[in-house]
Amino acid sequence: MAAGTSNYWEDLRKQARQLENELDLKLVSFSKLCTSYSHSGSRDGGRDRYSSDTTPLLNGSSQDRMFETMAIEIEQLLARLTGVNDKMAEYTHSAGVPSLNAALMHTLQRHRDILQDYTHEFHKTKANFTAIRERENLMGSVRKDIESYKSGSGVNNRRTELFLKEHDHLRNSDRLIEETISIAMATKENMTSQRGMLKSIHSKMNTLANRFPAVNSLIQRINLRKRRDSLILGGVIGICTILLLLYAFH
């Protein structure tokens, strides 16, 4: 019976790790899609993306369709991972050994933290993508109105020229801001990856220490002996220094 329940727990952990790996890859691609969408809008200048009056989500550009598809896939993966975490929680409550329960709860909390981080990252990237698309819609509409005004009136007065120059200046500033945001997002991805690696190393060290108390005790004794040797060495150096000073000023 114990072997069966242990296998069930390991199967749940395996499913959770597999879903977490899939979500990590999906979120990286999702973030890159958001960045490429922004750069594409800057290069196009709003001319090709807004050839019609409306740009619905599913009938717009290929990037819009890809965004919708990836968002649905990530939401499904998050839902599946949530279900696996719920099953793991039920298992921890049904387990009868207190010491085993503590270890299981620690593992469950770690998977819950990962799920929370992935959910937060998904919603943040999705909101950024929506904001960029709305801004591109607005800029494209302004560009279209300007072109319509120029073609309709046929007059290039100084006010229109100044407005166009100001518009181009704003677009250049917006592009610089987007590039800065892209660099920041890439840096955040690297920091998130490093944090995950550190968490994994810390968890493995804790697991090793819990499984092998003798190793943990040996490490503690080594650390105590190092501190003791450092104190002795410091005392010897201090005494020698005092003796040298007394000898020098004698």
UniProtKB/Swiss-Prot annotation:
- Predominantly, its location class is Golgi
Fetch the InterPro entries from UniProt. Answer: Golgi_SNAP_su1
Q: Name one Pfam family in it.
A: V-SNARE_C
Compositionally biased tracts (Basic and acidic residues): 41-51
Q: Which organism is it from?
A: Mus musculus (Mouse)
Spell out which residues are annotated as carrying N-acetylalanine.
A2
Membrane-protein topology: Single-pass type IV membrane protein
Record's GO cellular component, any one? Answer: Golgi membrane
Q: Which residues carry this modification: Phosphoserine?
A: S141
Expression induction per the record is: Decreased levels in 25-hydroxycholesterol treated melanocytes (at protein level).
Q: Which UniProt keywords apply?
A: Acetylation, Coiled coil, ER-Golgi transport, Golgi apparatus, Membrane, Phosphoprotein, Protein transport, Transmembrane, Transmembrane helix, Transport
Renumbered to this chain, region (Disordered) spans 37-59
Q: Name one GO biological process term.
A: endoplasmic reticulum to Golgi vesicle-mediated transport
Similarity-based family: Belongs to the GOSR1 family.
This chain belongs to the protein called: Golgi SNAP receptor complex member 1
What assembly does the database describe for this protein? Answer: Component of several multiprotein Golgi SNARE complexes. Identified in a SNARE complex with BET1, STX5 and YKT6, in a SNARE complex with BET1L, STX5 and YKT6, in a SNARE complex with STX5, GOSR2, SEC22B and BET1, and in complex with STX5 and COG3. Interacts with GABARAPL2.
The places in or outside the cell where this protein is found are: Golgi apparatus membrane
- Cytoplasmic side of membrane: 2-229
Q: What CDD domains does the record point to?
A: SNARE_GS28 (cd15864)
Q: Which taxonomic lineage is given here? A: Eukaryota, Metazoa, Chordata, Craniata, Vertebrata
Instruction: State what this protein does.
Output: Involved in transport from the ER to the Golgi apparatus as well as in intra-Golgi transport. It belongs to a super-family of proteins called t-SNAREs or soluble NSF (N-ethylmaleimide-sensitive factor) attachment protein receptor. May play a protective role against hydrogen peroxide induced cytotoxicity under glutathione depleted conditions in neuronal cells by regulating the intracellular ROS levels via inhibition of p38 MAPK (MAPK11, MAPK12, MAPK13 and MAPK14). Participates in docking and fusion stage of ER to cis-Golgi transport.
Membrane-traversing stretches: 230-250
Per the record, the coiled-coil ranges are 9-27, 72-93
In the UniProt record, the gene name given for this protein reads: Gosr1
